[in-house]
Amino acid sequence: QNWPHPPMPP
């Protein structure tokens, strides 16, 4: 399941 996750660092 894919839930809204915070943006990943570059």
Swiss-Prot record:
Protein name (database record): Bradykinin-potentiating peptide 10d
Molecular function as annotated in GO: peptidase inhibitor activity; toxin activity
Function: This peptide evokes slight hypotension (-2 mmHg), when injected alone into rats. It has no bradykinin-potentiating effect, when 60 nmol of BPP-10d are coinjected with 0.5 ug of bradykinin into rats. It inhibits angiotensin converting enzyme (ACE) activity with a K(i)app of 9.12 uM.
Residue(s) carrying Pyrrolidone carboxylic acid: 1
Transmembrane segments: none
Any GO CC annotation of this UniProt entry: extracellular region
Keyword Membrane: no
Compartment annotation: Secreted
